[in-house]
Regions:
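Amphipathic, Lys/Arg-enriched alpha-helical "gate/interface" segment within cytosolic domains
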Residues: 1-119
Length: 119
């Protein structure tokens, strides 16, 4: 299964961005794939769920994530993220500040999906 794919929850499509357990090279590859999918959708239409569980970040991947979140802003109706812990909280804050997006953090994928389909 691909790292970027549509899943369905309560009959609504959610674009799942699976960065879990990715190293830096895999993060860049997943970002490129996400850009292609998201930016070919109608504006203000995409629900995104991003999983960053055990993802390895560095300065370059952090910058790339900021650019992804900012560039996707016109297309994303709502986004949620799971897997934020430790130092990733600092990266998360940088991404949301840079993009100006409100992307809530959830401890559980199911809760994130429930929230997304209500948006």
């Amino acid at each position: 299964m691909g790292k970027v794919r549509f899943i369905h929850h309560r009959g609504k499509p959610i674009l799942f961005l699976d960065f879990s357990h990715c190293n830096a090279d895999e993060v860049f590859k997943t970002i490129d794939e996400a850009k292609q999918v998201i930016r070919n959708q109608p504006e203000n239409s995409v629900l995104t769920l991003t999983d960053v569980t055990n993802t390895k970040y560095n300065m370059k991947t952090t910058q790339a994530m900021k650019e992804l979140a900012n560039g996707n802003k016109p297309y994303v109706k709502a986004g949620a993220v799971v897997g934020i812990d430790g130092l990733k909280k600092i990266i998360y804050e940088a991404v949301t500040r840079f993009s100006g997006r409100n992307i809530p953090v959830f401890d559980d994928v199911e809760k994130a999906k429930d929230w997304l389909v209500e948006q």
